[in-house]
Amino acid sequence: MPQRFIVVTGGVLSGIGKGIFSASLARILKDSGVNVNILKIDPYLNVDAGTMNPNQHGEVFVTDDGYEADLDLGHYERFLGINVSRKNNITAGQIYYSVIKREREGKYLGSTVQIVPHVTSEIKDRIKTMDGDLLVIEIGGTVGDIEGEVFLEAVRELAFEIGREKFHFVHVTYVPYLRTTNEFKTKPTQQSVQLLRRIGIHPDTIIVRTEMPIDANSLFKVSLFSGVPRNRVINLPDASNVYEVPDVLHSLNLHKLIAKELDIDINDRFNWSYPKSFELLKIGIVGKYLGTDDAYKSIIESIYLSGAQKPIVIDAQELEDMTDEQIKNYLDDFDALIIPGGFGRRGIEGKIKAIKYARENKKPILGICLGMQLMAIEFARNVGKLEGANSTEFDENTPYPVVNMMESQKEVLNLGGTMRLGAQKTQIMKGTLLSRIYDGQEVVYERHRHRYEVDAEAFPQLFKNPGEEGYKLTISARSDFVEAVELDDHPFFVGIQYHPEYKSKVGKPHPIFKWLVKAAGGKIND
């Protein structure tokens, strides 16, 4: 059980960077010699994020142990340089499911099951099972959300039971700038802190998020009306690069203040290195989730951490109505393309057209999960002349099911948590570009999230092993399934069934993205 706790709450509105702040502070303390762990609490009733729409909630992040999580766990892994697990995320759905299950099993011995104490006790018990000496707890949403109240009550009770001196509460809030009057408005933050105090939680530190640096008088007002000392009201304006945040926090010495208050010994060593200059490469993600960049968060960050500027999301549906010439005119402007994972029929034909363009014009392209499957379909249609080739996901009656549902998935009825998930052993074939990318490693463990597979056995005319002759897709990685394909005589035509984006860390992006960036810059043989 952890001995010290930092609890991060949010105020005014969501999406203001609690996850980045929590990950940054945890990284600083980790580098300072503290055995730190981190936990994300999501108040939604979903058991996990696996069935959520990426347009609404952002990407689903997959851990090594096969848990489908909120994208904040991706921030934790990238910033801390660690691999988290399902234990690092608690949802309201998990808590209520567990409590109801216990009641049905008679574990409460006939008690009237209530929010307090039964639900709060379940939350506290899960927090107590976490590893590490110091636990950073990020509570999702904002203070005042009805679904989050039970979690705030649980951490309040925990602080009372264990000892308030072992807890440090950080409230991350937002102060808007009203351009019509040229002033910052602190009233929403004041009211947010008042709500928190009514619950029984008095913040020790307030992080004031703003679009631009705030004036000292506004910070004084936040301090005065919140009852938090001025030196603990800290402004964090928007950064052009989120990887600047740990440096900024470290310079503000917040970690020293917290360590002193929690009686933690630190050595104040901080080793933080991230890309500060970027190649001006235009890399396109041919996708279908356009509502937010968060839908492809880990891919975007992997490209960024590999030293290239932020990729652009291309609407796959727009490509569907274009001719080959129009697509060429449009995509010629890009240095490389990525076909990401996804589900459903929408935009599929546009992605296939983009793959055809990249194959014929030797444009560097990376297909991830569904992207690899579509590479096989495109090759079957346009090279193998198998008219109507498809995946049974999109056409159950296709005459050429190049992509089919895995046998183990055909009897599965529920959608949540039932795919082939998490780290799976993958054998890399010698003599392939993929083998060069992995620096000769023969076995790797990569994270998966899929129900469908490329059926190479049924269509041997389309695939070959490394070193064999003929214009076919080379199978460059295997498990019980086809894990990767590539194309000879092409600078970078690589499809992978797994998701390398989930394993990129600050200072250590996944090598597949580093090589894609090299190919985009024409440096594949450097």
From Swiss-Prot:
Cited Gene3D superfamilies: 3.40.50.880, P-loop containing nucleotide triphosphate hydrolases
Binding site for Mg(2+): 72, 138
Catalytic activity: UTP + L-glutamine + ATP + H2O = CTP + L-glutamate + ADP + phosphate + 2 H(+); L-glutamine + H2O = L-glutamate + NH4(+); UTP + NH4(+) + ATP = CTP + ADP + phosphate + 2 H(+)
UniProt: ATP binding residues: 15-20, 72
EC number assigned by the record: 6.3.4.2
UniProt region (Amidoligase domain), positions on chain: 1-264
Binding site for L-glutamine: 342, 370-373, 393, 451
Limits of the Glutamine amidotransferase type-1 domain: 282-526
Sites where the protein binds CTP: 14, 145-147, 185-190, 221
UniProtKB keywords: ATP-binding, Glutamine amidotransferase, Ligase, Magnesium, Metal-binding, Nucleotide-binding, Pyrimidine biosynthesis
GO cellular component, one term: cytosol
GO biological process: 'de novo' CTP biosynthetic process; pyrimidine nucleobase biosynthetic process
UniProt-annotated binding residues for UTP: 14, 185-190, 221
Pfam families: CTP_synth_N (PF06418), GATase (PF00117)
Activity modulation comment: Allosterically activated by GTP, when glutamine is the substrate; GTP has no effect on the reaction when ammonia is the substrate. The allosteric effector GTP functions by stabilizing the protein conformation that binds the tetrahedral intermediate(s) formed during glutamine hydrolysis. Inhibited by the product CTP, via allosteric rather than competitive inhibition.
Pathway(s): Pyrimidine metabolism; CTP biosynthesis via de novo pathway; CTP from UDP: step 2/2
Residues annotated as catalytic: 369 (nucleophile), 499, 501
Annotated GO MF terms: ATP binding; CTP synthase activity; glutaminase activity; identical protein binding; metal ion binding
PANTHER family in alphabetical order: CTP SYNTHASE, CTP SYNTHASE-RELATED
Additional note from the record: CTPSs have evolved a hybrid strategy for distinguishing between UTP and CTP. The overlapping regions of the product feedback inhibitory and substrate sites recognize a common feature in both compounds, the triphosphate moiety. To differentiate isosteric substrate and product pyrimidine rings, an additional pocket far from the expected kinase/ligase catalytic site, specifically recognizes the cytosine and ribose portions of the product inhibitor.
Role this protein plays: Catalyzes the ATP-dependent amination of UTP to CTP with either L-glutamine or ammonia as the source of nitrogen. Regulates intracellular CTP levels through interactions with the four ribonucleotide triphosphates.
Family note: Belongs to the CTP synthase family.
Quaternary structure note: Homotetramer.
UniProt protein name: CTP synthase
UniProt source species: Thermosipho africanus (strain TCF52B)
